[in-house]
């Protein structure tokens, strides 16, 4: 993305590139070696791209989605209809799952920030989730 989009952004003197990763960008789970390496690599890619392009007006940011997204077409298919419905009933009420439209608002905010206060890394997590570093 950066390789293809950055020349146009450099020409304009501005632009935003947002990469999204999962929790595995910070910590790996048992049996997910390749996934953790890829997500961690994406996080580091954002840092190096930011170092390369920020002075040219290009904002590169990494958004970590650290939680279950209320998405029947993805999480629902992965879990199956019954388990997904149970998750919605137990954690989805009161906005306990990440809501896609609210996530989109956050992405929009990051994409339109003034360059004096760019966000370079951001975690999205529902209020009902306990951060992974606080688990007993």
In which residue ranges do the predicted regions lie?
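Residue(s) in the substrate-gating loop at a strand-loop-helix junction
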Residues: 22
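Active-site loop immediately N-terminal to the catalytic Tyr-X3-Lys motif
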Residues: 27-33
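C-terminal helical subdomain
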Residues: 55-58, 62-67, 79-136
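Active-site helix of classical SDR
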Residues: 2, 38-42
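Active-site-adjacent segment of SDR/Rossmann-fold oxidoreductases
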Residues: 4, 9, 27, 48-58
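Conserved catalytic-site region of short-chain dehydrogenase/reductase
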Residues: 25-27, 69
